[in-house]
Amino acid sequence: AFGDALDAARAAGENVSVVALTRLAVSYEIMPERDIQKIIALARAAGAKIIVDDAGGARVGPAIFDQPKSLEFDVDIASTGLDKYGTIGPRLGLLAGDADLVADIRATGFELGVEARPMLYPAVVHSLAQYKPQRVRDLVATTKQVAEVMKARFGNRVSETPVTAQLKGEDILEMAMERAGI
């Protein structure tokens, strides 16, 4: 699908200069490593820079799915957040990769007023230092235990991915309406 979209963009005369991908979707579905590698290869062939938005996937991918770490992929930039699986905050994003690109992005961040304040740096170091892949595995195992309890109570309304369980908004609304007799 991505290759078709890339081909269509090039056929339309568009210059594809950047390709961004997300390893772990907001829905908590993981992109398979083979798909990531295929996208990277196609993007490289097109001469595009590659950014991986790895907010939650930076830790879930390696710890749960035995995928490479973000920068072990052939990408130019990787980003993640410290408020996701296995880290303890603060709530901010990290950017790593090609030093020149990171410097350019950081300068733009300063211009826009969205850079991390230096007073947060010690908390960033602490969060990264305490990180262990086992913590992610433990969090996922606990989530699966909670999912079993939820399924016993809510049945097939519980939706599961390999790393999370959830009740969808429409199911919560339906249950509330049932309880209200509506």
Please describe what each predicted stretch is:
Residues 158-182:
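Conserved C-terminal alpha-helix-loop-beta "cap" of PLP-dependent enzymes
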Residues 1-136, 146-155:
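Conserved PLP-enzyme active-site core in the AAT-like
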